[in-house]
Amino acid sequence: MEQVVIVDAIRTPMGRSKGGAFRNVRAEDLSAHLMRSLLARNPSLTAATLDDIYWGCVQQTLEQGFNIARNAALLAEIPHSVPAVTVNRLCGSSMQALHDAARMIMTGDAQVCLVGGVEHMGHVPMSHGVDFHPGLSRNVAKAAGMMGLTAEMLSRLHGISREMQDQFAARSHARAWAATQSGAFKTEIIPTGGHDADGVLKQFNYDEVIRPETTVEALSTLRPAFDPVSGTVTAGTSSALSDGAAAMLVMSESRARELGLKPRARIRSMAVVGCDPSIMGYGPVPASKLALKKAGLSASDIDVFEMNEAFAAQILPCIKDLGLMEQIDEKINLNGGAIALGHPLGCSGARISTTLINLMERKDAQFGLATMCIGLGQGIATVFERV
């Protein structure tokens, strides 16, 4: 079986969904920009030799509809002979895209794939056109389709206090801002055209969603966003709404050698699981455990974790049940996470994997694990190993 390696991994800055940098930029353009950028950064690879493009996107309608992967590839002037497919596993879409491409390469059905994902939550809101089947309520609690309420449920089941959530959210912003100031994100962010507050076209090379002024004290004044009577989850402890894309160049280790490209990491294992939709945010726990089992590793072997921060109330129970509460500041989301950077749904799997690989290089780490919860009760995880 072929070894699958990541040769390159990049992303756009994360733009605010409400009147942000990408308010006049379409999702296809964000995607095409990264496709072009990956090819430009790796000139020994010709676009015509790509076997396939796998692109995650959740709300596949309006500008994100009709197979956005193919639309973006055409905009990027990738040869017509290269196919492209859009993948949807809700929040895990672009990580699923990575898994799909990896399996094709492992089996020898492909050698080189472009992988990534996008979500423009300013142009195509998360709830746009969603119409749940009324019969679902026979089998699943109605609140299971309301992500904030599932986070409230997790916090109650696991004893996660409002103060713990506020502290974690403040940490996310502080870490993301520190990474921005130190230049840690420069290795992954590709400058991307957008418009400033005055409507002037400019190149953005930083995430505009981070709020460096965030404090625990300020967060403690916010009202519950989903359960106004007895809730603890606020807008400040939820992932920000943002627009963005991320992309990875994935290939067999043998093809990378042929092209003279240095692999940055290899995929050690992959896993996806289902869980109770009412606690959908718990998915990373069984997914991570399964991925670790497949890799022949334990949580203690992992040097760095990237866990998508859908909600502080959601990620803290996962950290707790993976036995990592004492190692948060040494191993988990060292450059902040989605509470600070946002969670553009179809982008996030590739985004956290990109950030993880950069962190692994900076820390000279051997193993890293990226994982995320998925709406309606799923979890997905990938174990990476430095080459």
From Swiss-Prot:
Primary subcellular site in the record, as a coarse category: cytoplasm
Subunit structure: Heterotetramer of two alpha chains (FadB) and two beta chains (FadA).
Entries under PANTHER family matching the protein: 3-KETOACYL-COA THIOLASE FADA, 3-KETOACYL-COA THIOLASE, PEROXISOMAL
Function, in words: Catalyzes the final step of fatty acid oxidation in which acetyl-CoA is released and the CoA ester of a fatty acid two carbons shorter is formed. Involved in the aerobic and anaerobic degradation of long-chain fatty acids.
A molecular function GO annotation: acetyl-CoA C-acyltransferase activity
Compartment list: Cytoplasm
Protein name per Swiss-Prot or TrEMBL: 3-ketoacyl-CoA thiolase
Top enzyme category: transferase
Organism: Salmonella typhimurium (strain LT2 / SGSC1412 / ATCC 700720)
Reaction equations catalysed: an acyl-CoA + acetyl-CoA = a 3-oxoacyl-CoA + CoA
A GO CC term assigned to this protein in UniProt: cytoplasm
EC number: 2.3.1.16
NCBIfam families in alphabetical order: AcCoA-C-Actrans, fadA, PRK08947.1
Gene Ontology terms describing biological process: fatty acid beta-oxidation; phenylacetate catabolic process
Pathway: Lipid metabolism; fatty acid beta-oxidation
Signal peptide residues on this chain, from the entry's feature table: none
Keywords assigned by UniProt, alphabetized: Acyltransferase, Cytoplasm, Fatty acid metabolism, Lipid degradation, Lipid metabolism, Transferase
Residue positions of the active site: C91, H343, C373
